[in-house]
């Protein structure tokens, strides 16, 4: 395909036009008085959102240079969303301010590489200042306030704080759509996985269609169990102990399954067979998690263990197991707390080293099942459009709350960035590097000014007033009052604020040092087909 090339100022201005088109659509959503954006969908109802990354993803521009500029800013929003779960609009506003101020200086003759170095040093200094000023999140109320700001709804913030209080910081909080109106919170006690009983004959509570085993032995097998002679030696020992048995294996079939079912129906022996969750290596890892949680061992030929020679000491234990058609819950496994802590540390290290979002998500789920718990927030709304928008807001708020617990919080509303400006005076820079630091100085005011503008206030006046206020005091845009924002519950996770700044600066540096842009040449539209009537007049239809 033919390419088109732009150089120097033309290239940079083309990229900037694309950045501005995207940023102008995104920044109207910033702050408590920000507006929504409606996104057309080819299929189904349109989406209404105030989430920066969702808006950015939908924007496709026609001009090839503008398209590349917009794609670069999409990367800012996406990276910030991946790392912190929020702050995508702030990142976009910062990127726009840095690029605008930077290109003005490049056009005036500044060296782009010097500017880039200055921007990087200034951002490093501001990040250091933000981390030093961060306050640890210690109370349920602080978590609720942080989540409420992200979601724009206090009731959502309260529910997320309650969920985190119940499942702990390592727990998983998922958001599901509900058929009922409003919000509900469901908590899972113990480890739950999405496999149920193999046969309906195992049910012990016909009304609820579930099998409940009190104080059972738990047999974990990495292979299929099909012949009864493999199981018999172990079954006899379990029956003598007078306890029920839960078998979790790759599969239980044939005469082994028949024997278990017949004994259950006759009332001789209570047991339930369940397929192990997952596939391949993930299944092995999850079985090992269960073994550590219940204090048992996985019967596997890889470690030299077989069913025929298995002893009762290899079985795990739990206070209670509840099995439905679709899922199994192990409550209070009898595993050693040190072994569980070691396994948790191992999974956490795997999360740190994982490059795949999917793998990271699955590891996070395993971590939650071992270390915390699982909470499900069910969201309902009057229409499908509102439901999708609400679900998205709750998901963002959950990630925001987790980020707050991780690294602490700073004053919200763009105030923490503005109050970090004096720290740049400590940098001893000269020439273009000093100019680069000044670009950051100007850009740090942009989020606060945009929040003020969206709230119908004069941005310059608000910025001046906040600049002269004590650290942490700023505009509460929801009420229009200048106050101590942390005390008022207006806080941002420092992880979100620093990620937004770091990612914006990274892309701004690329913009400023660009000297040529190579893009695909737009294809000419095919000529319309000729008139089939041959242009004959006098034909009346």
UniProtKB/Swiss-Prot annotation:
Primary enzyme class: isomerase
Location relative to the cell: Secreted, Capsule; Cell surface; Secreted, Cell wall
Cellular component terms (Gene Ontology): capsule; cell surface; cytoplasm; extracellular region
UniProt source species: Mycobacterium ulcerans (strain Agy99)
Family: Belongs to the chaperonin (HSP60) family.
Record's keyword terms, sorted: ATP-binding, Cell wall, Chaperone, Isomerase, Nucleotide-binding, Secreted
Enzyme Commission numbers on file: 5.6.1.7
NCBIfam families (alphabetical): GroEL, PRK00013.1, PRK12849.1, PRK12850.1, PRK12851.1
The protein's name in its UniProt record: Chaperonin GroEL 2
Lineage, uppermost ranks: Bacteria, Bacillati, Actinomycetota, Actinomycetes, Mycobacteriales
